[in-house]
Structures are given as C-alpha cells and as structure tokens.
C-alpha cells in the first residue's frame, strides 16, 4: 500500500507553526497605520515650512494666511494638507518677521504634531525645548 498525502498530525503541526509565526508578526505591524498618519502630519509641516520660507524670501515677512488654491491670493501661501490632516491656526510672533508656529492633527489618531520657526511661542506639542523647524509629535 503506497498512500500519498499528509497525515492529520503533520497538517496540525503546520497549522500550529503558522499560528506561532502570526502571533509574532502581528504585533510588529499593529501600529503601522499610526506611524503613517504621523509621517503625513510631519510631511505637511515640512512642506508648510518650505512654503512659508519661499513667501518670506519674496516678502521679508511670514504670513498667517494659508490658501489651498494655486496661485495663492495676494498675501497668502498656497498650501494644502494631506487628506485627513487639519492645519491649526498659523500664528506669528511679535511682528511678522519674528517667526511663526502651528500644529496639525489627523482625524484617525489622537496625536498631533507642531512646529515653530523663529522667535515665537511654540504651539503645542512643539515647545521651546524642541529644535526650531523640526516637527514634534505626541
């Protein structure tokens, strides 16, 4: 008698091994979406820094007017956030040449990211202890 195939024990061992591998792998990928939301918020803040600095180079001042149309109306910066991200109010320091600060939130996470440039009181979660121009998330 020459039977071909796997025994029930062999199949059961394979299922157990797959279960063990899944138990190890799933926690490593559990917060992947959270990391992606944070990365999109940081990216938006870095892109806003670029837009504000370009505006500053032309106007010798920062602006608090952000517009999601291109070309931007006079006195504003053309900038659109990633889908799901919401930009907080952009505030400048004493005088529009001093600097600016803002934060961004995402509808899918409770975390937020903030940034500041220049001599301005940073918007949370950024703080005076955080590096200038670097997005800070918490």
Region roles according to the model:
Residues 6-10, 43, 85:
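Intrinsic-disorder/low-complexity peptide segments enriched for small residues
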Residues 10, 39-42, 129-131:
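Compositionally biased non-globular segments, especially hydrophobic aliphatic-rich helices
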Residues 15, 42, 49:
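Conserved catalytic core of two-component sensor histidine kinases
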Residues 50-138:
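Periplasmic/extracellular, small/polar-rich flexible segments of pilin-like filament-forming proteins
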Residues 28-45:
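Aliphatic-rich helix starts adjacent to a transmembrane/signal segment
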Residues 1-29, 33:
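N-terminal single-pass transmembrane signal-anchor helix
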């Amino acid at each position: 008698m020459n039977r071909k195939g796997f025994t029930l024990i062999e199949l059961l061992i394979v299922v157990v091994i797959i279960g063990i591998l899944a138990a190890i792998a799933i926690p490593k990928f559990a917060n992947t979406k959270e990391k992606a939301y944070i990365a999109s918020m940081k990216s938006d803040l870095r892109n806003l820094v670029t837009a504000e600095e370009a505006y500053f180079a032309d106007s010798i001042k920062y602006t608090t007017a952000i517009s999601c149309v291109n070309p931007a109306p006079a006195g504003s910066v053309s900038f659109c956030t990633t889908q799901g991200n919401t930009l907080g109010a952009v505030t400048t320091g004493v005088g529009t040449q001093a600097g600016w600060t803002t934060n961004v939130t995402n509808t899918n996470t409770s975390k937020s990211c903030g940034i500041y440039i220049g001599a301005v009181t940073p918007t949370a979660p950024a703080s005076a202890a955080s590096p200038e121009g670097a997005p800070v998330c918490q």
